[in-house]
Amino acid sequence: MSKRTLRIATRSSALALWQAEFIKAELERLHDNVDVELIKIKTQGDKILDVPLAKIGGKGLFVKELEEAMLDGRADLAVHSMKDVPMEFPEGLGLVAICEREDPTDAFVSNQYEHIDQLPEGAVVGTASLRREAQLRANRPDLQIKVLRGNVNTRLAKLDAGEYDAIVLASSGLKRLGFHDRIRYCLPDTFSLPAVGQGALGIECRVGDTELLELIDPLNHTDTWDRVSAERALNRRLEGGCQVPIAAYALLEDDNTLWLRGLVGAVDGTQIFRVEGRAPRAEGERLGRELAEQLLSMGADKVLAEIYGHTPR
């Protein structure tokens, strides 16, 4: 069989390149007849670093240009952090695999303090996420939360320069880049419920390319797919993007029972709406939609309306 060259569209950040290299290595390990190249692309989210993501329209900021590369034939597939993947895909493209989830937690990183409880009143904490900000403010209303944009190395450099007393970012990204030692501890999900899909990698490609779909299929992790699909169903009903104070985290309690927790928070932390439920794993998406409806009826609709400018329909 002749060799097929697959081209992965990827952002140029260290973390995005790590993720793309990981998928490249897996594809080449699984298939002797495949060579993989990386196509580096700058996205809108990479170009605008001085404005909070939520202000520039948080949906798809890190994927649109990658999708254009697949649609016009420059690339065959793209690797995404699942927490960045929009709910809707352009015609002809789709999410075809979710790899086994790594650490889904948020990490507390500080050069002076071992634990968030040790932060003095008024301490400055950096994060780029409204979800993290809402939960931080709910737990520690005395803290100053400041926007922290940029890639992982940039964020750590800003902490080291003394601009922040602590920063909070995804544990998985730090670990993938070898920064295990920078994590003081991982925030428990009771303190900071993770983002939809956090810690998992997704693969998007042209859905009509059956040969490519067969090559990618072994990378799909069924347990992770079912968990993240339930989380995304909740998020879809709430019209959430990656820059909205929505959290959802699903666990498999046994082979068949899915436990899903969801949260919507006012960014100032004064209101946090929480729901949870269980269902057979095959009904995870239904559970996600039902829990989203519960959140809306509890008052999350008003919180989200302030952010979106309209109530989720």
Curated annotation (Swiss-Prot):
GO CC, any one term: cytoplasm
Catalytic activity: 4 porphobilinogen + H2O = hydroxymethylbilane + 4 NH4(+)
Enzyme class: transferase
Pfam families for the chain: Porphobil_deam, Porphobil_deamC
Function: Tetrapolymerization of the monopyrrole PBG into the hydroxymethylbilane pre-uroporphyrinogen in several discrete steps.
Gene: hemC
Protein name in the entry: Porphobilinogen deaminase
Cofactor(s) this protein requires: dipyrromethane
GO molecular function: hydroxymethylbilane synthase activity
NCBIfam families, per the entry: hemC
